[in-house]
Amino acid sequence: MDTRKRGRPEAGSFNSNGGGYKKSKQEMESYSTGLGSKSKPCTKFFSTSGCPFGENCHFLHYVPGGYNAVSQMTNMGPPIPQVSRNMQGSGNGGRFSGRGESGPGHVSNFGDSATARFSVDASLAGAIIGKGGVSSKQICRQTGVKLSIQDHERDPNLKNIVLEGTLEQISEASAMVKDLIGRLNSAAKKPPGGGLGGGGGMGSEGKPHPGSNFKTKICERFSKGNCTFGDRCHFAHGEAELRKSGIV
């Protein structure tokens, strides 16, 4: 009988039962904790989907050179263009003139949050806001954008219109502002007595002409919250402004 003790197989030695080599204790710890395995960059971390494992990930979340270095190592392709957080172009940025010509700066990556800034004539700022903020509220409510009006940095004859939201919201709101300015200028060019907001029906002292239809009907747009003419509107903004036909 062989009385010699059989020694325990050393870690890393051949395992006759398993048909291979056992993993050493250090290797097992590295596998279970992730230590020693962070030798390659995490492609998920550097993608648009992101890595769901956080600090428990077995791959690198920090690589010198960032995305460009990782893309060269893993052939991930060119980096995703970043959306500009300030859509103001060179000089004054975009500008709406008195004729309603646009525009805000370059836009891309729809769905991303951004800020657009463009200039308008200061005389148009009040009409863009509307009586009691009705016009600006309508734009914000319809597009979801946040609209504010600020003083221009250099020209006191201009005001800055600032739009905050997604690029799609900003694009829609910009179109609404452009349309509003166009209608305001069109109404201002109408001769006395012609159409909404042109001053027709008003006498030289700012009173309605006898027999005019000024403020004899309720403004449907005001009832819906989207009248852009304010005090210049020919229709009554509520029962208090309503007058009988032909009565001064």
From Swiss-Prot:
One of its GO terms (cellular component) is nucleus. Residues 90-103, 192-204 have a biased composition (Gly residues). A zinc finger (C3H1-type) spans 36-64, 213-240. Residues 113-177 form the KH domain. GO terms for biological process: positive regulation of leaf senescence; regulation of DNA-templated transcription; regulation of photoperiodism, flowering. One of its GO terms (molecular function) is DNA-binding transcription factor activity. It comes from the Eukaryota. Keywords: DNA-binding, Metal-binding, Repeat, RNA-binding, Zinc, Zinc-finger. SMART domains: KH, ZnF_C3H1. The keyword Signal does not apply. It holds the Pfam family zf-CCCH_2. Residues 1-37, 87-110, 188-209 are annotated as: Disordered. Transmembrane segments: none annotated. PANTHER family: CCCH ZINC FINGER/TIS11-RELATED. This is Zinc finger CCCH domain-containing protein 36. It comes from Arabidopsis thaliana.
